[in-house]
């Protein structure tokens, strides 16, 4: 595992992380990244990762409930249609036709997977997630320059591309190709809150 830091991060923050690695999470390699911002660090990480899957999490999230990470990896290995499993920052709510405000405006049960509750979603987001690296490198990276999106972002170009394909071809057909899931069942709990007490995830 690798932890990347933005170059602006203060020394005490880095010391806190290193203390955790030394005393609780042995075996984690800490890399002081020269990049600044989410996109260049994400891009560097996914291109240098030596495992089939990558866990991405920024420093400012509070994970509210336990996550069965080994089971997530088992499911992603078994089912080739599962490419992204993210922790929802809202409950896996009923469908809401307001995609400009809430990315998970479609949530559906996934009956093909019995080992773990996952919810099919219309969202691509970079809140904490496990991603299948081959899917990103073989397909999704080519959407990062999607017209009309912020090209300094990972999330927005991919979300806009995913949403537009859903509008053109329908959710089920497009989801079968993209394979984006929320952790937990439909109407399940939210798993995240921002540590900065921002409004993100409050709706």
Predicted regions and their residues:
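Short beta-strand-to-loop acidic/aromatic patch adjacent to the donor-nucleotide binding site
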Residues: 52-62
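A short, glycine-/small-residue-rich helix N-cap motif at loop->alpha-helix starts
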Residues: 33-41, 64
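Short beta-strand-to-loop element that shapes/binds the nucleotide-sugar donor at the catalytic cleft/hinge
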Residues: 83-99
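Conserved donor-nucleotide/metal-binding helix-loop-beta segment in metal-dependent transferases, i.e.
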Residues: 66-88
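Active-site nucleotide-sugar/metal-binding loop of Leloir-type enzymes
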Residues: 43-53
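C-terminal catalytic/acceptor-binding lobe
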Residues: 124, 128-203
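Acidic donor-binding segment of Leloir-type glycosyltransferases
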Residues: 1-30
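A recurrent flexible, glycine/aromatic-enriched loop bordering the glycosyltransferase active site
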Residues: 92, 110-131
């Amino acid at each position: 595992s690798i932890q990347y830091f933005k170059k602006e991060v203060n020394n005490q923050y880095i010391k806190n992380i290193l203390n955790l690695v030394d005393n609780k999470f042995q075996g984690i390699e800490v890399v002081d990244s020269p990049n600044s911002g989410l996109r260049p660090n994400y891009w560097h990480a996914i291109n240098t990762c030596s495992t089939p899957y990558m866990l991405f999490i920024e420093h400012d999230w509070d994970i509210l409930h336990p996550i069965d990470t080994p089971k997530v990896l088992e499911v992603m290995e078994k089912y080739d249609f599962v490419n992204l499993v993210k922790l929802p920052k809202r409950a896996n709510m009923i469908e809401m036709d307001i995609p400009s405000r809430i990315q998970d405006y479609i949530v559906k049960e996934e009956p093909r997977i019995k080992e773990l509750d996952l919810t099919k979603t219309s969202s691509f987001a970079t809140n904490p997630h496990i991603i299948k690296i081959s899917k990103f490198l073989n397909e999704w990276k080519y959407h990062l320059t999607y017209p009309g999106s912020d090209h300094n972002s990972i999330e927005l170009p991919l979300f806009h591309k995913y949403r537009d394909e859903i509008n053109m071809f329908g959710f089920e057909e497009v989801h079968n190709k993209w394979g984006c899931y929320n952790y937990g069942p439909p109407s399940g709990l939210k798993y995240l809150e921002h540590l900065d007490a921002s409004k993100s995830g409050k709706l």
